[in-house]
Amino acid sequence: MIRFAARAAIALSLSLALAAHAAGAEGGVSSRLIEYSVKTKLKNYEQLTLFLLPPESGKAEGVLCLSLLAKDPDEVRAQLLGTSERHSHHRALAFAAERNLAVVAWGAHRLWDPSRNWDELSRAEAKKIDADFDLVANAWDAGIKYFAKNHGLPAGGYLMMGSSGAAQYAQRLALRRPERFLAVHVHIASSFDVPVKKGASLLWCVTTGENELGYERTRRFFRAARDLYSPIVYKAYPGLGHEGNAKVTALGFACFDYALSEYARATKLNGGKPAMPDWADIFSSAPSVADVFNQAVYSKFDYLCVPVEFRMLLPEPLRAKWSAE
């Protein structure tokens, strides 16, 4: 009986300590969280609210952007504080903290048909969607400039991630403001805007599931982006539907770390002035070629083993994470 009481007391003390630690962490995040809203000039999406979470050190060495599935600013705030009942981003926030990155987050608002790609829209539909989201991208950029001017946010070299509808938003934003981004990971996006040449300046990680309803649309984006010489790491996970898993997250973070290392290398070669990696050169010299349909990797010299439609150059640092089943 005494042992049971002692164990219960220890368990209670541990629970209280963990709760206190979580509350302290939440309080620390809350005290650093900065909110800024920008008018979009759209009637059905009048205002974009951005949240900035500086690193504990105060001076960020980079930026991780989170495009979130959140209907309003309160939900974005709850997700960042870890109090949301819908979504948790502790792994992304931990990734940022470990690398001394600031976090910029917002709620994704849909202005397009989530069940269609650019190549399934009429010209009039595409024109309207483009015009509307151009205004959103302008508002987003105005918010970034505010954070840069008033809170020391770096001007470029950003990482960005999003899933589902938030990935659709992230992909469209990256195509409109590629100069801000170093690498983007979009998962189960299911709806894509048309790739453009200026989008080849950043590293794309595009993941989905073979059982996901938008699987074919994701493959079409991969082929179109690759044919514009965009550096792209594409992976469709067998058996996966409209969901994520640890391997998806690991591949995305591996792409981010790879991009950060190449960014640091390019910056060093540029005398310390921030410089983007030469992705075209990096990918053209990759030693491996992947078959994205049959989930196989070959030496680059055996590229003829892979049909052109499924062929993807794969840098060596990403091979292990891409091959994980």
Regions found by a protein language model. Name each.
Residues 59-71, 78:
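Short beta-strand element of the alpha/beta-hydrolase
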Residues 80, 103-135:
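Cap/lid segment of the alpha/beta-hydrolase catalytic domain
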Residues 21-62, 132, 161-176, 318-325:
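A domain-start/cap signature at the N-terminus of enzymes
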Residues 122-152, 172:
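Alpha/beta-hydrolase active-site loop
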Residues 77-104:
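Short amphipathic alpha-helix adjacent to the substrate-entry channel of hydrolases
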Residues 147-201:
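Primarily recognizes the serine-hydrolase "nucleophile elbow" in alpha/beta-hydrolase
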Residues 179-256:
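The feature captures the conserved acid-bearing segment of alpha/beta-hydrolase catalytic domains
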Residues 228-229, 238-325:
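Alpha/beta-hydrolase-fold serine-hydrolase catalytic core, especially in secreted/extracellular enzymes
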